[in-house]
């Protein structure tokens, strides 16, 4: 007999204000959904909204009525482009949920969203295992110490395997202890085996969902809880033993208790639950659950896992707090001075600029004067909102631990920190410590954009500025000589979507040119130049700019002016605008005006250096992947103009570049963007695909593996050793008749996976090529590289590698 265990709450949009009323910070979960494209992120999110009582029906990606994917481009393409935030309740707890894109072109959306999360749900397609973009988003979350739970989705699909997915987690992700908390349960039919539910390893029960044709029962709220049947007892005991043994590996106390009786069933559920939560938050383990969001099976348990295992803002703060931080500070986050972080800026048709903010400490109240430590400017918070995807509700305040929106402010950008105006004198305290920077990746594609007429140009420029403010990974430049406008982005789709939004949302009248690859230049020798500029008072500003190759870690000139600690601090942050800038040092008893702070001087020098690197000597491409610093030798009065610093550093940088080129043209190299490529194809096509990649496109093949087998890479070989001691659930046949299968992975032939790194210029339109080579029997995916050739120095996610001389002669004859 079926009975309702979970029932949707009857909360609807008119009562939004309930979400603001007296919810303890300990009852909040700030969680992101991260995954590869098409893993089921938005579908899972829409089901959560239904079970949380936010919606009265399931939003569907295919029919274009989802709450979270609300942009026209998202509904047209059926993919997530913008990260969307929404709040709903589950078990009397508030979940602030962010659904992020899975397409490689929109990886910056994930980066800035992850920066404000306390936890993440990583979705993995059970029929495909860990995919290319899964690795990228996993590393983004791991880099920031975000606790995670894994949801193995699509367990209803043919070819889905929890065991193979766990294997791929071991071999592809930095996840030594995935805790299998659930096993899939299928029907016993010979011809067709349906996915019915799960074995709950922790709660020691079987949970089945109604999969009949009864529409009243298939919304996922009708379930049956049963004792573990004898037919599944062996699987259950094996999984239970593995769960306890994994926890013993990370908890000595539990290990000692286990050695007394060696009985995994002797531990209470509460005892294991507390350890799982503690070790999940610390990052030692990752709970693994399974289900099918499309079929409404086992969605509620993942919502329970968000509440049970992922941290509240207080718990996440405590995890990252230094040992010197007192417990009083941790407990009273909402009583501390304001500290908030901006992670997104958009332009609303009627409300203007909307700034998304996560309040880490204190309370952001309407009318409060906010101070920006970066710009040293203040603005008043006129209106505040709770956010529900594309809809908002005005509120009086945004409390600690919550996510909200500020409207109308102009002095704050993505990544900025907000503090009280009253605390502005101590802003350096807020910029130090654990405030991580949101990295803006270098664009890899470029296209011209032309206004239809001269009168359309001002509106186009304004739209481009707004788009850049909203999405810093989208950039634009205008040639000072011929006025040509160029837009830059993370890929073809990124530029196409950005252009569509410029036209449809911002009202720009313009045409888009052909998308091309954006190249860069770099230097391989040290260069130096000194510039002397005179003020109106005939005072001389003497500035010396040094440019050092990115590969030169041990440059003696750098070590002469900076300590090892200063050097490592800059390198740990990575490049910004393609430069590792170490700052400036005074020389020869340098005296500067009292009103100029060290930071303001450094900012203006940096702006000048970046401007000086905007055009390289080979083909006019921007210079990147280099290190720089400068020294100042001056005796200046208090009326010294700050702009002179920018002018001098820009001139010295240009002189350093072109004087080196004049002496040694071979000291410069062209860089081109590379992409990580994953091609899944039947074994018979591996030879022809590999030949095309290497012979025609200059690719480097990293590995060729069989789907479901262990990878051959170094990291995977390490994981293979681990697998000998780790639990892998036995495979269960999945639901659909094999002869009805049409996808690639359902083929009866051996499926191989080719992983390679390829110049982007060679694969701009590779989908049609790979389809022709394999007669439509291949799956082609691209992602931005996560590892660079100089990992100690190059910015996270750098895609640019030196171009071979052979390719350089062909492309630039």
Curated annotation (Swiss-Prot):
Residues 1-20 form a transit peptide. Coiled coil: none annotated. It holds the Pfam family EFG_C. GO terms for biological process: mitochondrial translation; mitochondrial translational termination; ribosome disassembly. The keyword Protease does not apply. One of its GO terms (molecular function) is GTPase activity. It comes from the Eukaryota. Mitochondrial GTPase that mediates the disassembly of ribosomes from messenger RNA at the termination of mitochondrial protein biosynthesis. Not involved in the GTP-dependent ribosomal translocation step during translation elongation. Residues 26-314 form the tr-type G domain. GTP binds at residues 35-42, 99-103, 153-156. PROSITE patterns: G_TR_1 (PS00301), G_TR_2 (PS51722). InterPro entries: EF-G-like_DII, EFG2, EFG_II, EFG_III, EFG_III/V, EFG_V-like, G_TR_CS, P-loop_NTPase. It comes from Schizosaccharomyces pombe (strain 972 / ATCC 24843). One of its GO terms (cellular component) is mitochondrion. Belongs to the TRAFAC class translation factor GTPase superfamily. Classic translation factor GTPase family. EF-G/EF-2 subfamily. Keywords: GTP-binding, Mitochondrion, Nucleotide-binding, Protein biosynthesis, Transit peptide. It is found in: Mitochondrion. This is Ribosome-releasing factor 2, mitochondrial. Gene3D superfamilies: 3.30.70.240, Elongation Factor G (Translational Gtpase), domain 3, P-loop containing nucleotide triphosphate hydrolases, Translation factors.
């Amino acid at each position: 007999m079926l009975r309702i265990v979970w029932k949707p709450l009857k909360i609807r949009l008119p009562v939004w204000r309930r979400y603001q009323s007296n919810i303890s910070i300990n009852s909040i979960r700030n969680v992101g959904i991260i995954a590869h494209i098409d893993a089921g992120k938005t579908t899972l999110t829409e089901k959560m909204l239904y079970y949380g009582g936010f919606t009265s029906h399931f939003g569907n990606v295919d029919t274009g009525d989802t709450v979270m994917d609300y942009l026209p481009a998202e509904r047209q393409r059926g993919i997530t482009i913008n990260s969307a935030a929404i709040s709903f309740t589950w078990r009397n707890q508030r979940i602030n949920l962010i659904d992020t894109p899975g397409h490689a072109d929109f990886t910056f959306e994930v980066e800035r969203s992850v920066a404000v999360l306390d936890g993440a749900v990583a979705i993995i397609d059970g029929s495909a295992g860990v995919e290319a973009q899964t690795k990228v988003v996993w590393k983004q979350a791991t880099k920031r110490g975000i606790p995670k739970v894994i949801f193995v989705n699509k367990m209803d699909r043919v070819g889905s395997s929890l065991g193979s997915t766990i294997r791929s987690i071991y071999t592809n992700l930095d996840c030594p202890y995935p805790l299998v908390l659930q096993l899939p349960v299928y029907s016993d039919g010979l011809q067709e085996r349906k996915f019915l539910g799960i074995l709950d390893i922790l709660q020691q029960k079987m949970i089945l969902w109604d999969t009949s044709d009864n529409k009243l029962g298939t919304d996922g709220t009708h379930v049956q809880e049963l004792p573990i049947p004898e037919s599944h007892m062996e699987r259950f005991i094996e999984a239970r033993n593995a769960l306890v043994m994994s926890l013993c590996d990370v908890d000595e106390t539990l290990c000692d208790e286990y050695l007394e009786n060696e009985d995994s069933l002797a531990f209470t559920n509460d005892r294991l639950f507390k350890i799982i939560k503690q070790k999940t938050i610390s990052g030692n383990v990752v709970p693994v659950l399974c289900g099918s969001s499309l079929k409404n099976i086992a969605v509620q348990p993942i919502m329970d896992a968000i509440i049970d295992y992922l941290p509240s803002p207080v718990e996440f703060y405590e995890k990252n707090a230094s040992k010197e931080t007192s417990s009083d500070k941790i407990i009273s986050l909402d009583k501390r001075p304001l500290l908030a972080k901006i992670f997104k800026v958009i332009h609303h048709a009627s409300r203007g600029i909307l700034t998304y903010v996560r309040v880490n400490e204190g309370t952001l109240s309407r009318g409060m004067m906010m101070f920006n430590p970066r710009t040293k400017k203040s603005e008043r918070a006129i209106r505040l909102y709770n956010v529900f995807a594309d809809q908002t509700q005005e509120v009086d305040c945004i409390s600690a631990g919550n996510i909200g929106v500020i409207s109308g402010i102009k002095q704050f950008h993505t990544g900025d920190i907000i503090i009280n105006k009253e605390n502005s004198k101590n802003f350096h305290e807020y910029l130090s410590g654990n405030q991580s920077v949101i990295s803006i990746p270098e664009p890899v594609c470029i296209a011209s954009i032309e206004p239809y007429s001269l009168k359309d140009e001002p509106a186009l420029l304004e739209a481009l500025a707004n788009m850049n403010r909203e999405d810093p990974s989208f950039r634009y430049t205008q040639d000072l000589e011929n006025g040509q406008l160029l837009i830059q982005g993370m890929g073809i789709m990124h530029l196409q979507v950005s252009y569509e939004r410029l036209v449809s949302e911002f009202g720009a009248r313009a045409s888009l040119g052909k998308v091309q690859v954006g190249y860069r230049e770099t230097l391989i020798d040290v260069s130096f130049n000194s510039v002397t500029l005179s003020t109106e008072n005939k005072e001389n500003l003497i500035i010396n700019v040094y440019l050092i190759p990115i590969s030169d870690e041990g440059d003696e000139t750098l070590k002469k002016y900076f300590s090892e600690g200063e050097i490592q601090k800059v390198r740990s942050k990575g490049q910004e605008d393609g430069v590792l800038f170490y700052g400036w040092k005074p020389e020869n008893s340098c005296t500067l005006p009292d009103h100029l702070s060290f930071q303001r001087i450094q900012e203006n020098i940096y702006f000048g250096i970046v401007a000086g690197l905007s055009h390289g000597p080979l083909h006019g491409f921007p210079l990147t992947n280099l290190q720089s610093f400068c020294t100042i030798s001056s005796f200046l009065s208090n009326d010294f103009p700050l702009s002179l610093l920018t002018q001098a550093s820009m001139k010295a940088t240009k002189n350093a570049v072109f004087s080196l080129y004049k002496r040694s043209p071979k000291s410069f190299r062209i860089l081109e963007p590379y992409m990580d490529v994953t091609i899944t194809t039947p074994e018979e096509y591996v030879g022809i695909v590999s030949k095309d990649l290497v012979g025609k496109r200059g690719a480097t093949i990293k590995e060729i593996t069989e789907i479901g087998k262990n990878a051959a890479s170094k990291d995977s070989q390490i994981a293979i050793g681990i697998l000998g001691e780790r639990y892998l659930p036995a495979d269960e046949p999945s639901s659909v008749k094999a002869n009805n299968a049409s996808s690639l992975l359902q083929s009866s032939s051996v499926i191989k996976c080719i992983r390679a790194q390829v110049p982007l210029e060679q694969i701009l339109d590779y989908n049609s090529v790979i389809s022709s080579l394999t007669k439509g029997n291949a799956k082609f995916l691209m992602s931005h590289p996560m590892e660079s050739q100089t990992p100690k120095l190059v910015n996270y996610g750098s895609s640019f590698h030196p171009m071979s001389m052979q390719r350089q002669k062909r492309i630039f004859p």
